[in-house]
Amino acid sequence: MKIPYSLYRTLHARYPQAIIDVMAPAWCRPLLSRMPEVNEAIPMPLGHGALEIGERRKLGHSLREKRYDRAYVLPNSFKSALVPFFAGIPHRTGWRGEMRYGLLNDVRVLDKEAWPLMVERYIALAYDKGIMRTAQDLPQPLLWPQLQVSEGEKSYTCNQFSLSSERPMIGFCPGAEFGPAKCWPHYHYAELAKQLIDEGYQVVLFGSAKDHEAGNEILAALNTEQQAWCRNLAGETQLDQAVILIAACKAIVTNESGLM
């Protein structure tokens, strides 16, 4: 959800008067609320794997009263293009994906060598396809994702979790979205934590409840003095709290996790 923010920022920069609404799963709302370019977060009530054409038709029809001028369809799946089609949105832009001719009427055919980065692919959709042939054609600098978090929120949330203001924070995200094969070993995290704590930092471990045990393994490898400067918050934060605390960190060390 964060990478597409570059598209929203680019659209806002090109069309300052445009009203940008985003349809996404309800859990994304805390992230979207930190994107000032986004006017409204519309919850997608259907699950990731569900086709449910009838429900998508009903959802699309419910959006017709908003009279959107353009839709940008970011997932590559066939079903993701159904709602804007049923909503009768005149211009429907996206990468071809699952052969979505007809559902999309501004179809881009992906050349992975020409567009190596996902963020570049999203930003390219904000421009006419005849102009943007490769990533080299994109205006620089790119508008990178940058969630808005205030200093007051950082201070308040750090106090909520009794994190010290005496030492700068380094965040670890030791879990992985797709299993242990993509995990940096916990003992490497532990060695890095020891080094950072001895250099004057505090270490904060982030993740879901399923990552809590991994965090405890990292903690267990530290001596008593070092443990005083390492907090395992995996499974203890809401998404919005995690976003704020990560923004308060000097750096993040992460696997290919959801928080990444």
PLM region spans:
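Catalytic machinery of carbohydrate-active enzymes
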Residues: M1-M260
